[in-house]
């Protein structure tokens, strides 16, 4: 059985390099975390994650604090960024961001594949909760990046 997949395509009226840099900017990643019981930490030595860096998300779900650590495993400046789970409740998690230049901006493609634990809780969470939750977080992150990239707000982060 194939892993569940989320595929989102977004037009952003901004150059690919700017969009790429905003996607990996820690302050925007932090803004995209939805709830008051959610936070992130990163191993990045600067304000932007790079190849090999980790990002750890902490969130309270189903009455329990949970952590997911992602590592940047693919990094093609201005073209592709991939985050993969190193530690967490899922069996697998992979989020690929692709950036395609077009005449009037960038097409950003987000592809997320994940695999749930095979136990009852994993199946239940996947059926009633996880896909919707992941889509909500990813769409929120896209909206924030788009808002910064298409306005003058990007200057405050990227100079």
Predicted regions span which residues?
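Glycine-rich portal/gate segments that line the openings of hydrophobic small-molecule binding cavities
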Residues: 40-87, 140-148, 154-159
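Beta-strand elements of well-folded, non-transmembrane domains
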Residues: 12-14, 61-63, 74, 89, ...
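A short, structured loop/turn motif at beta-sheet edges
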Residues: 15-17, 74-80, 98-107
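Generic structural detector for well-ordered beta-strands
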Residues: 7-13, 58, 71, 98-100, ...
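Hydrophobic ligand-binding cavity/cleft-lining segments
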Residues: 1-46, 50
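Beta-strand/loop substructures that line and gate deep hydrophobic ligand-binding cavities in soluble
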Residues: 84-136, 156
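Short, surface-exposed coil-to-beta transition loops
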Residues: 5-7, 65-69, 92-95
């Amino acid at each position: 059985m194939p892993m569940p997949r989320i595929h989102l395509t977004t037009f952003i009226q901004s150059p690919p390099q700017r969009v790429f840099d905003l996607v990996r900017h820690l302050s925007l990643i932090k803004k995209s975390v939805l709830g008051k019981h959610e936070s992130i930490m990163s191993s990045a030595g600067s304000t932007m994650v790079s190849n090999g860096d980790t990002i750890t998300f902490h969130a309270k779900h189903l009455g329990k604090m949970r952590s997911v650590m992602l590592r940047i495993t693919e990094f093609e400046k201005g073209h592709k960024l991939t985050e993969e789970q190193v530690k967490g409740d899922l069996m697998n998690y992979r989020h690929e961001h692709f950036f395609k230049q077009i005449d009037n901006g960038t097409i950003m493609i987000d592809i997320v594949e994940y695999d749930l634990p095979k136990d009852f809780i994993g199946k239940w969470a996947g059926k009633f909760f996880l896909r919707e939750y992941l889509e909500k977080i990813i769409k929120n992150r896209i909206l924030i990046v788009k808002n910064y990239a298409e306005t003058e707000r990007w200057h405050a982060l990227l100079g």
